[in-house]
């Protein structure tokens, strides 16, 4: 039996999971303050949910999807990204109904799966934090979504991120751009990669997202979508940029930005971080945009929508360098040491009382010698040690010691039930 994890997966061990919890708690609190509520969707869906949303010619569908036939013969896929499952839930659970407040704003934190080469910040199972907003075509919805991404990264402690932004215009604009790309790439078709030769037929926009050197040499001179924008698309994009200016959110208009999924319409954006010690070039840690037709693709009513997703592994790599405080083990509040007959029962009772009051408290279930218990308290990063022996138990008096400076006080067993008062005395 091969006792090891599959390639492209990692174990997030207890010494690491604390920092993940802090990031997720920060994000959860941030989203709640913006009146976004959590949604949880299945880790797997019917294959068509992802193939229709991501696009049959996208790299995700062509190469990266984990899909299989289950024992009932159903074609199933593990989710490669978060949006499609949320849209499916929006339609299936009729969140478009008039009694549901619009915009319908949700966030999620979930595992996603793609078969790709494992690298720094990207595994075959990775974690995504995302938001989706359904029901508003107003540029304010785009600006709020971008602002939330910007402010969340700042609140988490990311320091050198840069917003890249572009627009894909409306359907008419994209058709004109599609034809221009076909005209540009067709004469050099035989020099393109096999994937891009197929994309030229199915969706030439995907060629712009190619990482193959055979394709990349043609990209600098490729048509730019800004040259095909109509007046409405220009006005929409300019209004978004103007509001970002007024909010003090810096950006770079990036003509090469197309995003890797077929469902995007209108504004698209990425927040990128450049760190040569992690990646050779600037890398996206948050990306999103508008997708006004995906709900209809899933047989729902016409519904404008916008959202973003964060790759949590990449985010954690950046934060480890830029916000190391996040990764410090803060330890527990109390460790109860005990020695002597009858003290073990009292130790567990004290731990229970402290935990009920909201403190982190532990004791030694193995009942090692006192020296070993103090060693464990130190290893667990306890801020205070409560010592309980037969004498203390008989007298009903405990000793509490603050390990940072050695300050000690005596307290009665009854004082344990109001530990906040004791803590105030210790601070004084």
Curated annotation (Swiss-Prot):
Catalytic activity: tRNA(His) + L-histidine + ATP = L-histidyl-tRNA(His) + AMP + diphosphate + H(+)
The keyword Electron transport is annotated on this UniProt entry: no
GO CC, alphabetical: cytoplasm
First-level EC class: ligase
EC assignment: 6.1.1.21
Any one GO BP annotation for this protein: histidyl-tRNA aminoacylation
Cited InterPro entries: aa-tRNA-synth_II, aa-tRNA-synth_II/BPL/LPL, Anticodon-bd, Anticodon-bd_dom_sf, His-tRNA-ligase, HisRS-like_core, HisRS/HisZ, HisRS_anticodon
Keywords, ordered alphabetically: Aminoacyl-tRNA synthetase, ATP-binding, Cytoplasm, Ligase, Nucleotide-binding, Protein biosynthesis
Disulfide bridge partners, by residue number: none
GO MF, one annotated term: ATP binding
Transmembrane segments: none
Domain of life of the native organism: Bacteria
Annotated localization: Cytoplasm
Entry-linked Gene3D superfamilies: Anticodon-binding domain (3.40.50.800), Bira Bifunctional Protein, Domain 2 (3.30.930.10)
Subunit structure and binding partners: Homodimer.
Family: Belongs to the class-II aminoacyl-tRNA synthetase family.
Protein name stated in the entry: Histidine--tRNA ligase
Protein species of origin: Lactobacillus helveticus (strain DPC 4571)
Name of the gene: hisS
């Amino acid at each position: 039996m091969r006792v090891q994890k599959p390639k492209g997966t990692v174990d997030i061990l207890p010494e690491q999971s604390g920092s993940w919890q802090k990031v997720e708690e920060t994000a959860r609190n941030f989203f709640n303050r913006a009146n976004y509520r959590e949604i949880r969707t299945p880790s797997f869906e019917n294959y068509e949910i992802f193939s229709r949303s991501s696009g049959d010619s996208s790299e995700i569908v062509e190469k990266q999807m984990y899909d299989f036939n289950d024992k009932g013969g159903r074609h199933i896929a593990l989710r490669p990204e978060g949006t499609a499952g949320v849209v499916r839930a929006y339609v299936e659970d009729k969140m478009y109904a008039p009694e549901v407040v619009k915009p319908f704003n949700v966030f999620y934190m979930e595992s996603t799966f793609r078969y790709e080469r494992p690298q720094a910040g990207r595994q075959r199972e990775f974690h995504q934090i995302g938001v989706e907003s359904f029901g508003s075509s107003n540029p304010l919805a785009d600006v709020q979504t971008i602002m939330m991404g910007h402010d969340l990264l700042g609140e988490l402690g990311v320091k050198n991120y840069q917003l890249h932004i572009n627009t894909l215009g409306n359907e008419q604009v994209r058709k004109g751009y599609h034809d221009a790309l076909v005209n540009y790439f067709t004469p050099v078709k035989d020099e393109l990669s096999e994937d891009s030769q197929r994309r030229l037929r199915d969706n030439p926009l995907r060629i712009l997202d190619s990482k193959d050197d055979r394709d990349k040499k043609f990209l600098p001179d490729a048509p730019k979508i800004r040259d095909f924008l109509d007046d409405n698309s220009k006005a929409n994009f300019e209004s978004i940029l103007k509001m970002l200016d007024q909010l003090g959110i810096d950006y770079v208009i990036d003509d090469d930005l197309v995003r890797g999924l077929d469902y995007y319409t209108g504004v698209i954006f990425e927040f990128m971080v450049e760190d040569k010690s992690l990646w050779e070039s600037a890398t996206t840690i948050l990306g999103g945009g508008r997708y006004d037709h995906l709900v209809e693709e899933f047989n729902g009513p016409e519904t404008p929508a916008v959202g973003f997703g964060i790759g949590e592994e990449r985010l954690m790599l950046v934060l480890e360098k830029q916000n190391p405080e996040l990764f410090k083990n803060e330890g527990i509040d109390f460790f109860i040491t005990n020695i002597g007959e009858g003290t073990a029962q009292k130790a567990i009772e004290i731990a229970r009382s402290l935990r009920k009051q909201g403190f982190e408290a532990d004791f030694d279930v193995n009942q090692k010698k006192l020296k070993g218990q103090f060693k464990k308290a130190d290893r667990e990063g306890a801020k205070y040690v409560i010592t309980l022996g037969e004498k203390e138990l008989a007298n009903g008096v405990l000793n509490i010691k603050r390990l940072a400076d050695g300050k000690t006080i005596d307290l009665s067993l009854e004082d344990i039930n109001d530990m906040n008062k004791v803590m105030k005395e210790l601070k004084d």
